[in-house]
Amino acid sequence: MEANTRSTGRLPAAFLTPGSSSFMDFLSDQSPEMLPGNRSLPPLQGAVEAPHGTTIVSASFPGGVVLAGDRRATMGNMIASRDMQKVFPADEYSAVGIAGTAGLAVEMVKLFQLELEHFEKVEGAQLSLEGKANRLSTMIRSNLAMAMQGLAVVPLFAGYDVDREKGRIFSYDVTGGRTEESGYAATGSGSIFARNAMKKLYREDLTEEQALTLVVQALYDAADDDSATGGPDVARRIFPIVTVITDEGFRRLTDQESSEIARSILERRLEQPDGPRAALL
């Protein structure tokens, strides 16, 4: 872009020329070096020590979908942060939870939010939930070079589909491959434990309150077996970030609401340390 536009107070011509409704396409044309995937890295000497986000879980219910994440970030065998935010609103009817390299993941979320906002301003309408999931897939794929050097970003995307009138969940791999999940999903280092917990407890007829409890139960089980996942920290008053998306839009539970769910689970775990048990038949 021309530097002398600053002295005239006018926007560069590129900003006034009709083009794609994709902000990433615009940035790729005008300042490609600003896209995360276009940055070159020096040859790596050993493992990269960077903070990593860990476990994200999601579950759908008849009125929408919930998305939650623990608060711990790790760097090797160290705890890098105890209160990291890993779940963000993407727009009014969707949210994204991040796992993987924390700095790159947060940057990707901000770019994704801007991408959706730009589309809505240019087109005068929101992108469909399917379209949003595809845009995120493209962004993850653009980070493949960094992922191959150990700096991967693997998010979980969930939202309320206003056309189908239901909640939907999408998971991804490091190449940008997208999978729509049925009922529940998890990503991150503790995902195998969280997914197993939800597998035994999930039902299609869950109420919103039950779905909220389910994801916190799953995070508790993940923290129980995965050292990189942080459980509810009562002493520091740090609890999972829990969000719900319905036909009324995105809502993040307050700290008080999250703490009430977590504390009720902790009380029950004093009697049943391994959590609720599913029936054998």
UniProtKB/Swiss-Prot annotation:
Top-rank EC class of the record's enzyme: hydrolase
Please state the pathway this protein functions in, per its UniProt record: Protein degradation; proteasomal Pup-dependent pathway
GO terms, molecular function: threonine-type endopeptidase activity
Keyword tags:
Autocatalytic cleavage, Cytoplasm, Hydrolase, Protease, Proteasome, Threonine protease, Zymogen
Task: List this protein's GO terms for biological process.
Answer: modification-dependent protein catabolic process; proteasomal protein catabolic process
Q: What is its main location?
A: cytoplasm
* Positions of the propeptide segment: 1-53
Key word Metal-binding present in the record? no
Q: How does it assemble?
A: The 20S proteasome core is composed of 14 alpha and 14 beta subunits that assemble into four stacked heptameric rings, resulting in a barrel-shaped structure. The two inner rings, each composed of seven catalytic beta subunits, are sandwiched by two outer rings, each composed of seven alpha subunits. The catalytic chamber with the active sites is on the inside of the barrel. Has a gated structure, the ends of the cylinder being occluded by the N-termini of the alpha-subunits. Is capped by the proteasome-associated ATPase, ARC.
Q: Which family does the record claim for this protein?
A: Belongs to the peptidase T1B family.
* Cross-referenced HAMAP family: Proteasome_B_B (MF_02113_B)
Q: Any idea what this protein is called? A: Proteasome subunit beta
Q: Can you name the source organism?
A: Streptomyces griseus subsp. griseus (strain JCM 4626 / CBS 651.72 / NBRC 13350 / KCC S-0626 / ISP 5235)
